[in-house]
Amino acid sequence: MSVVGLDVGSQSCYIAVARAGGIETIANEFSDRCTPSVISFGSKNRTIGVAAKNQQITHANNTVSNFKRFHGRAFNDPFIQKEKENLSYDLVPLKNGGVGIKVMYMGEEHLFSVEQITAMLLTKLKETAENSLKKPVTDCVISVPSFFTDAERRSVLDAAQIVGLNCLRLMNDMTAVALNYGIYKQDLPSLDEKPRIVVFVDMGHSAFQVSACAFNKGKLKVLGTAFDPFLGGKNFDEKLVEHFCAEFKTKYKLDAKSKIRALLRLYQECEKLKKLMSSNSTDLPLNIECFMNDKDVSGKMNRSQFEELCAELLQKIEVPLYSLLEQTHLKVEDVSAVEIVGGATRIPAVKERIAKFFGKDISTTLNADEAVARGCALQCAILSPAFKVREFSVTDAVPFPISLIWNHDSEDTEGVHEVFSRNHAAPFSKVLTFLRRGPFELEAFYSDPQGVPYPEAKIGRFVVQNVSAQKDGEKSRVKVKVRVNTHGIFTISTASMVEKVPTEENEMSSEADMECLNQRPPENPDTDKNVQQDNSEAGTQPQVQTDAQQTSQSPPSPELTSEENKIPDADKANEKKVDQPPEAKKPKIKVVNVELPIEANLVWQLGKDLLNMYIETEGKMIMQDKLEKERNDAKNAVEEYVYEFRDKLCGPYEKFICEQDHQNFLRLLTETEDWLYEEGEDQAKQAYVDKLEELMKIGTPVKVRFQEAEERPKMFEELGQRLQHYAKIAADFRNKDEKYNHIDESEMKKVEKSVNEVMEWMNNVMNAQAKESLDQDPVVRAQEIKTKIKELNNTCEPVVTQPKPKIESPKLERTPNGPNIDKKEEDLEDKNNFGAEPPHQNGECYPNEKNSVNMDLD
């Protein structure tokens, strides 16, 4: 079973896996642990990762990058429209209103959704993990920013489903970092002590996130999170690009923004310059050859100029930090440590601002690039039954407050209730009880739209169906279970109607039995490890009761314990009288929970038909990539064979082919090379396979002759040594050597016969081989000589290694030192000396066991 953590970033990705020795970040086929989040489309296949980034400038229009933030957003989203201006590829609206990415693939124009593009990247990460683990990868944990909304999280889950990944959890970036930090700490306070507060700061390529976490032994709780979704390393790059665009326009009269390739080159060089300025404070040059119109451009920048240029961005760093302390009601003095991760935190000015705010040195004990992936892998190992991990509970936080709105039964007024406040513990479940006579709707939305970096506050509309009044006309009690699951997604998991059914007196089935028969497990039984009782909201609305359940590590049931006790008093009286003889015959009441279907209309969720179509399309593209790779491998094999043999025919292979064949083969190799670069440039795989077989018919015998000429003398030498060894033993046997006089003469004759036969065979084949030229096939091959050596050893070795029979020597009686004493006298002496000091004989001391004392030795 695979245990994989995936950190899917805006600029790059990291893969961490759990092995027997711990968590390891694995490398791709380029021996790089960083895989760029780039997909390039060509006329034959897709390239993903490092190969795609290498051709980002030459194939700018068909290379897709920086698409992570497009998840779950509509095309007319203001953020999409702003980002569209800076992209090298085209964005178009899809039929469902989402963002479509238009590229040329396989010679045709294609539209791909963001889910499909992310699925392509996940395909590459999955392939890299499988190549490292040598087994299929299915289960994984994927990281998402903590500010991702319900729609964005559902979109990422759809992308994972397209590629066949079972995402056990969508884990917030900062929670993954905190888990990676805390699980290895051995000095955390115990559960009954004050927790250690640690603040984690992450500035990546496109976003800035901070979180405060409380640590106890074996426990992590996220107290709060804050963020700026539009502040990251990319913004610092943009400041440099704007500066040099203006400088080049003045200095060289070149408008870099007019050509996308020039602009992309400038972005790459500015990113390199930014990294160099992190370790150098002096002036650093920026040089680009043939930038535009065959002109070379140059510029320079130092760290102080860079910080002055980015002063506005640096001021934004403190805003999320203040927000975090305000949310969590913490003071700077309460923070034990500040840990930074993310590539952009390497900028000295960023580190200085963070350290100055908290008034303490910042810590860099975690790997800034790989911390998120490692935390995801740890979470996957905790969730996987295949690994035994130190017990460590993780309680996340809800980033945005969530409320429900509904219409009152037969009234025009609406009811509103905040079910999850900001930074509420997650995952968490609550039960709401409604009094209704018919079906009703619940609409979930974010209570604070201004604080959500998403234009739509609505989460979804949920219709509870098949609700009916009681037989006596009273309203039915409908229990609705709302939940924020392990992915951070809000859902209404179950709904049930409490129905009172009259029964005959002789029916003795209990209410508990009927409830068990009518209950069924929830559709998504996530494990609530950190749920707390919360009844503070109960009674805020006349028709709503809010309950929470203190759940264990078993999946929560749809019927909560705290709710079962809230039965009308009349019903309780009837329950108490079940076992008592009735004064008069009255119908008994049974309470039955009837499961109700829920229709969910979400703001963002791919339909099943569309999802299946995406899965099929991805499968076809994976197969096309595989076929193209096999075709390229076959073509490269022909090209490699041509170059290898042409060099060796004029070198070590020259003596092993006759002159005429030598010239013909060289001519064939040259013709094959010309064919590869002309009509053979784009052929089917079989054409290259046939061409390679044609070359190998001539080249393989030459290669074999060379290899045989190298190996044959070594094998003859080894055979000669073995023959000499056994012949010497046979001669020693004839000379009556004591070492071999135990061997039977008939056995030794077998050795002599085998030695003579093999020696005769060796002399014959060596003479025959000496008469042949090197350009002829060998008379005897090295493998045949190796077989002869094995046969010789099998015949002779058991005989010559026979051990000599052992001769038993007569037993000698041990005579003690000193005069012989009669046995009876010895016994008497022993009795008289009972408890005395043990005797010393031959320098040995025999301890008296009865008087021995157990001692502790240092």
Swiss-Prot record:
It comes from the Eukaryota. GO terms for molecular function: adenyl-nucleotide exchange factor activity; ATP binding; ATP-dependent protein folding chaperone. Residues 532-554, 849-858 have a biased composition (Polar residues). It is found in: Cytoplasm. CDD domains: ASKHA_NBD_HSP70_HSPH1 (cd11739). One of its GO terms (cellular component) is nucleus. Residues 563-584, 805-814, 821-832 have a biased composition (Basic and acidic residues). The modification N6-acetyllysine is found at K471. Phosphorylation on Ser-509 may be important for regulation of the HSPA8/HSC70 chaperone activity. Residues 504-514 have a biased composition (Acidic residues). Residues 500-584, 796-858 are annotated as: Disordered. Belongs to the heat shock protein 70 family. Acts as a nucleotide-exchange factor (NEF) for chaperone proteins HSPA1A and HSPA1B, promoting the release of ADP from HSPA1A/B thereby triggering substrate release. Prevents the aggregation of denatured proteins in cells under severe stress, on which the ATP levels decrease markedly. Inhibits HSPA8/HSC70 ATPase and chaperone activities. This is Heat shock protein 105 kDa. The gene is HSPH1.
